[in-house]
Amino acid sequence: MSRLIKMIVKCYHSVRLLLCMEGYKRAEYIRKHNLFGSMGENCYFHPWKMPGDPELIFIHDNVKIASDVTFINHDISNALLNTKYKTNKFKYFTASTEIFDNVLIGTGTIILPGKKIGPNCVVGGGNSSLQGCA
């Protein structure tokens, strides 16, 4: 699929998610249309914005994600370093995020690249995710 078509499809799904006012319906829409790497059962997804690399997000069962949670699955510091040092040796970094069963993620949390949030965790609002269980 061409890059332009992918962008159009992503915009379409973003608008459709905005129309799903309720978090359980959003999670169901994400699961039904395979927008993430995976979306488990009985999930709640309230963020308004779609992650940049949604295929790198894996959410297990009974996960509740509050509003204004941001998923970051890439790091573009390579652009800065390659320009500064006039090289191409610094590579673009992406990593998947996995959220295991029975997790609550509070409002305003930032989930950083490559993080795994273990089962039965509560991540308080406004935090940057740490590996494991907070």
Residue ranges of each PLM-predicted region?
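Terminal amphipathic alpha-helical/low-complexity segments used for targeting or macromolecular assembly
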Residues: M1-N42, S77-N78, N120
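C-terminal/domain-terminus segments
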Residues: M7-K10, K115-L130
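Generic detector of intrinsically disordered, low-complexity, polar/charged segments
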Residues: C20, N34-G37, V103-I105, I111, ...
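Flexible, glycine/small-residue-enriched loop-and-beta-strand segment within the central core
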Residues: R26, F45-I117, G132-C133
